[in-house]
Structures are given as structure tokens and as C-alpha cells.
Amino acid sequence: MLALKKATVFLVLLSGTLLLTACPSQTNIAKINRDPDHYRNKEVGIAGRVTDSYGVMGTGAYEIDDGTGKIWVATKQGVPSRGSRVGAKGYIHSGFSFAGRSFGTVLEETDRRSK
């Protein structure tokens, strides 16, 4: 019985460690906007409320406001609706254009979670 408890504790600790190392830490948007070169081509996580969105045929861009600033997120999935709370992770890029509109610094989404 003691061996089973030890194995369970070990698996829980191992799973937690893997989850923490696999996820990028959440970064506030003001830091990204203040120094986008520091974050360029690095994976970051952000979370906030969707304030604007543009979608075309399953792709698009949406803007997240985390209370410290706003940033556009480029997605190959459908865009979330305005007012939604989401968490997104991806890579920071500059000079992004979509449907003839320039978005400046953007997060290229690799994963999204609704809150």
C-alpha cells in the first residue's frame, strides 16, 4: 500500500513538472509592447478579453486587452467573439498584415483556451 502511495505522489509531481515546463509563462501585454524585440520569435502566453476581431474563412486576427495593454493575435482557427475571455500562446512577430490591414506587433497563435 505504501508503494502505491509513493508511486502516485511521484506521478503527480512528475505530471506537474512536465506541465509547468511545457507551458510558457504568462507575460503582460505592456511588457511585450514596450520591448517587442526582446520577445520576437519567442513563445509567450497572454490572457485577457477580446476587444476586436476580424475573420475570413477560418483565419483572422483578434485583439486581446489584459488591462495593461492590447495586442493583436493572428490565428489559423476561427476568431473568438468580442467580449470573450481567452488565453493564447504563440510567437511574437512584427510587421504583420491581414486582409490589407497592418497590425504591427502580433502574437502568432499556436494554442488558445477560453476562460
What do these predicted ranges mean?
Residues 18-115:
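OB-fold and OB-like single-stranded nucleic-acid-recognition modules
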